[in-house]
Amino acid sequence: MDRAPFTMRASVPGDGAAVLQIWRDAVDATHDFLSAADRKAIDAEVADFLPSAPLWLAVDGADRPVGFMLLNGAHMDALFIAPAHRGKGVGRMLVLHALARVPGLSTDVNEQNDQAVGFYRRLGFVPVGRSALDGQGRPYPIIHLRHMP
């Protein structure tokens, strides 16, 4: 497994297009359960918000974003990794960064995203609840997770 040297930094305004593309590519690779209409609607919502959101980025040696995380207090609202960099420790690096700052970190994951559920469980997250609908009332069940050291 290739583990290229990645570092972390806070996002800056010029990162907007790159993080939006990471989100789109990651969703295309992992969220095949979304209907086409919902995928389009969610894309529009994310495109309005994500480029200016205060993110933590994982960047490669050329300072190109390869993944990002959005923290909101003690909750991780988002974690997305460019498909070409999955399995290289990028997501783990971002989550460990958050856990070092926020013991008991919580996050939510789509129930249908088995890969993400397994990833979080391997890092010590446990289910603490479930919602039948996502945050926008769409029929995509959410598992609520909390890190238990």
Regions found by a protein language model. Name each.
Residues 1-14:
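Conserved N-terminal entry element of GNAT/NAT acetyltransferase domains
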Residues 16, 20-50:
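Conserved GNAT-fold acetyl-CoA-binding loop/helix
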Residues 45-57, 75, 138:
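A short helix-loop-beta-strand connector motif used in the catalytic cores of GNAT acetyltransferases and
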Residues 54-67:
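Conserved beta-hairpin
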Residues 75-86, 110:
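A short, internal acetyl-CoA/4′-phosphopantetheine-binding micro-motif in the GNAT/acyltransferase core
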Residues 87-100, 118, 122:
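Conserved acetyl-CoA-binding loop-helix of GNAT-fold acetyltransferases
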Residues 101-112:
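Conserved GNAT acetyl-CoA-binding A-motif
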Residues 121-130:
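Conserved acetyl-CoA-binding loop of GNAT-fold acetyltransferases
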